[in-house]
Amino acid sequence: MVKKTGQLFHIDFGHILGNFKSKFGIKRERVPFILTYDFIHVIQQGKTGNTEKFGQFRQCCEDAYLILRRHGNLFITLFALMLTAGLPELTSVKDIQYLKDSLALGKSEEEALKQFKQKFDEALRESWTTKVN
């Protein structure tokens, strides 16, 4: 989706709650989140060696993750309240547990950030699969 300001945004509760698409029993989405080389091309302003811009983007992602994590209990409570709302992506406590695991609420901030960085690297490394999807 595109705002009037030109900013892109997309809300997909399915992804943040661990509901990934499959077809004929094959998991179509195999990365923690979508981070294509096309996105990276735009972030780097079309320059292949512009690691400064990409570094800034990555730092913003890490900062945003930690902010979300700090408010994790609020998110868990709000999603728990929505269990009966009829959202197809939010039907069981298992969906909420996926969110807890993603935010690494049982871990220290350092461990949680390490987990996020690993997921970020995996999304980047396996981004070719999103083109196949």
Label the predicted regions.
Residues 2-133:
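ATP-dependent kinase catalytic cores of phosphoinositide-metabolizing enzymes
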